Regions:
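Alpha-helical transmembrane segments and their immediate juxtamembrane cytosolic regions
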Residues: 1-362
Length: 362
């Protein structure tokens, strides 16, 4: 069955679901044990777990036809407000976690809270428990850069030159990202990484334009999944990895090669999931709620640490962020997804009750 005969946004939700599961895994223990076999699960998902979100954003991107400022305002609203709102909520939990002993720090003073709130409002940080906040910085900046390049190149009347200029400018921006990342140039809002990810947006954009209607047979998806998985494992075995927060991108060629292979790995996996309605329902649901999972999964990790300490009474250090006990990796993975979903449901219920209360007293 061809992809275009179903809702394409659902397929993208599946990809985002794969991505958010990978992010939760990546922020948990990097190495897990099955019997005597050690699996480098963290380094593996780090090869693609951010690139897939930028691919999805490029896929969902719609050309700016008229007003660039309207586009910029919409994107800022759609990314800035949700990230800011949930970051402030996560900040409120910090002193509670200090009291519980799951964070090794002193209580935030009024001055500290004021600084953190200011940083959150200005996109300079998401508070101590929101370790993934920088992702929203680079996603917002890269989309704004990509949209601006597309808008200005669209002013060229000749379609051939328009496309050439668009692709060349995106390539130049990506090259700046490679250079600044290799030189460890820490720009404001992590712009060095935003530059780096603009070409990934282009890949998603071009995929939707030219390949999204292509028919993928199950056999082809399975073969591609095995091939891409094997290549990624080969990179890991040879000590080649990607960790953008540490400026680790292997090399200019390898970064984009690995990103493309990782995206193909996720796309082939999503194509297989797409054939199973029950799996599609679950994974696409996670994709639609990826923002909340992104924000609250570390909060969930620390809840696991606290409960483990209380129930077992083991003398362990539970104050490390994002997690404290490597042996609890299965629980981190599960609760890192379930707890954020429960938090979202709780917050939605509070908002709904507040609205009903206001209507009742009007």
């Amino acid at each position: 069955m061809e992809l275009h005969s179903k809702n394409r946004e659902t397929f993208i939700d599946i990809l985002k679901g794969i991505g958010i599961i990978s992010i939760v895994i990546g922020h948990g223990p990097s190495y897990i044990w099955f019997g005597k076999v050690q699996i480098p699960i963290g380094p593996f998902v780090y090869l693609y777990h951010l690139a897939i979100f930028f691919f999805c954003s490029g896929y969902l991107y719609k050309d700016i036809q008229k007003d660039l400022t309207v586009f910029l305002a919409k994107k800022i609203k759609s990314l800035y407000w949700p990230a800011t709102k949930h970051s402030l909520i996560a900040l409120l939990l910090y002193n509670l976690y200090v009291k519980m002993g799951v964070v090794d720090s002193s209580y935030l003073s009024r001055d500290d809270v004021l600084i953190d709130i200011t940083n959150i409002l200005t996109l300079n940080g998401g508070g101590p428990l929101f370790v993934a906040y920088w992702f929203f910085q680079i996603l917002l900046c890269s989309i704004l850069i990509f949209g601006s390049v597309q808008y200005f190149s669209s002013k060229i009347s000749n379609i051939y030159y328009k496309n050439i200029v668009f692709i060349v400018l995106v390539g130049v921006i990506g090259r700046i990202g490679i250079y600044s990342t290799e030189k460890h140039l820490g720009f404001l809002y992590n712009l060095q990484i935003a530059y780096l990810m603009v070409p990934i947006l282009l890949i998603g954009y071009l995929y939707k334009k030219y390949m999204s209607k292509e028919k993928w047979e199950v056999d082809f998806s399975i073969i591609l999944l095995i091939i891409t998985f094997s290549i990624l494992v080969h990179f890991i075995k040879n000590g080649i990895g990607i960790e953008l927060s540490k400026y680790e991108i292997a090399s200019a060629v390898l970064f984009y090669l690995i990103s493309i292979i990782g995206i193909l790995f996720c796309v082939s996996l999503a194509q297989i999931i797409w054939k199973c309605n029950k799996l599609t329902t679950v994974i696409s649901y996670l994709g639609r709620n990826s923002l909340e999972i992104m924000i609250y999964h570390v909060v969930a990790f620390k809840m696991v640490d606290y409960l483990y300490f209380k129930l077992k009474g083991d003398v362990i250090n539970i104050s490390s962020i994002p997690y404290s006990c490597e042996s609890l990796w299965p629980i981190y993975y599960v609760m890192g997804i379930l707890v954020p979903l429960m938090i979202k449901k709780l917050l939605n219920s509070i908002v709904l009750l507040h609205k009903r209360r206001n209507r009742y007293f009007q």
